[in-house]
Design a protein with these regions (language model features):
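C-terminal segments of enzyme domains that contribute to small-molecule binding surfaces
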Residues: 2-45, 52, 145-178, 207-236
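N-terminal segments that cap or nucleate solenoid repeat domains
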Residues: 41-76
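Flexible, glycine/small-residue-enriched loop-and-beta-strand segment within the central core
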Residues: 72-82, 87-178, 207, 215-216
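C-terminal/domain-terminus segments
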Residues: 81, 86, 176-212, 217-226
Length: 236
C-alpha cells in the first residue's frame, strides 16, 4: 500500500504526516492515555517493590523504609517479620520463619532458609553477597537420603534457630549452619564457614572460622549518635 501511494501520490510525505497528527490527537484524548496512576509511573522506574506491592506479598509484619528488590524471591512471607530500614537486594532468596530487626542490609545472591526453627537478624546487621544462612539442613553422612524431594522417613533433617545479634557483619561467600548464634558485634570474614556459636565483639575468618582479634566497639557510639539525629526521627 505504501509503495502504491508513493507512485500515485507524489506528496505521500504530507499524507503520512496528516495520519501521524491524527493518531496523536486521538491518543491524547483517549481515556487510557489521560489517566496513568502516579504509583504506576514510579513503579516502572523502581527496582524495589512499592508500598502496595509489599502489602500484597503478604508479610506477617513489616515496618517503614523497607526496600525489597523485585528480583528477590520470597517464600512463606506469612512467616516473616521485617522491621524498619531494611534493604534486600537482587536475587536474594528468603524462605520460612525469618525475623529481621532494623537497619539491615542483605546483599545480592544471599540465601536465608529459615525452616520452622527460624532465622533472627537483630539490629544493624549486614550480610554481604553470596552468603547462605541455614536454620535447616540435611544429614550428609551417607546414613540417610537427602534433599527436599525425599520422604521424611528416609531423611534426617537437622534444624536449629540461627541468631545474628546487633552489629553483626558477615563477609561475602560465608556459610552459617543451623543452631549457630553470632553474638553481639561479631564480624565474619569473607568465605568463612560457621558451624558453632561465636563470641561477642570478636573477628573470625576461615573455613572453619577461627578467632583473629577483638573488634572495635565504636559502632555503639555511632548508633547512639544516629538515634539522636534528625535522620533517625525522619526514618521512624
Amino acid at each position: 500500500m505504501i509503495e502504491i501511494r508513493r507512485v500515485d501520490n507524489p506528496e505521500y510525505a504530507e499524507y503520512f504526516e496528516w495520519i501521524y497528527r491524527k493518531c496523536c490527537r486521538a491518543l491524547k484524548h483517549s481515556e487510557a492515555a489521560a489517566f496513568v496512576p502516579v504509583e504506576k509511573k514510579q513503579n516502572a522506574n523502581s527496582s524495589f517493590f512499592s508500598e502496595s506491592e509489599l502489602k500484597a506479598i503478604g508479610f506477617l509484619k513489616y515496618g517503614k523504609n523497607v526496600l525489597v528488590s523485585r528480583k528477590a524471591s520470597i517464600y512463606n512471607p506469612e512467616q516473616m517479620v521485617l522491621g524498619d530500614n531494611i534493604r534486600i537486594d537482587d536475587f536474594c532468596i528468603l524462605s520460612g520463619n525469618i525475623k529481621l530487626g532494623s537497619y539491615i542490609h542483605i546483599s545480592a545472591y544471599t540465601c536465608l532458609i529459615g525452616g520452622t526453627k527460624g532465622i533472627v537478624l537483630q539490629d544493624f546487621v549486614t550480610v554481604s553477597s553470596r552468603c547462605a544462612v541455614y536454620a535447616v539442613s540435611d544429614d550428609f553422612s551417607g546414613e540417610h537420603l537427602n534433599n527436599s524431594m525425599i520422604p521424611t522417613a528416609y531423611r534426617r533433617v537437622i534444624e536449629g534457630q540461627v541468631i545474628l545479634e546487633d552489629y553483626v557483619s558477615v563477609g561475602t561467600g560465608s556459610i552459617i549452619l543451623p543452631g549457630v548464634k553470632l553474638e553481639e558485634g561479631v564480624a565474619v570474614g569473607a568465605m568463612s564457614f560457621v558451624k558453632h556459636t561465636l563470641e561477642r565483639w570478636k573477628i573470625y575468618v576461615g573455613a572453619p572460622c577461627r578467632y583473629v582479634k577483638d573488634r572495635n566497639q565504636n559502632m555503639k557510639q555511632l548508633r547512639a549518635a544516629l538515634q539522636n539525629s534528625d535522620a533517625y526521627e525522619e526514618s521512624r
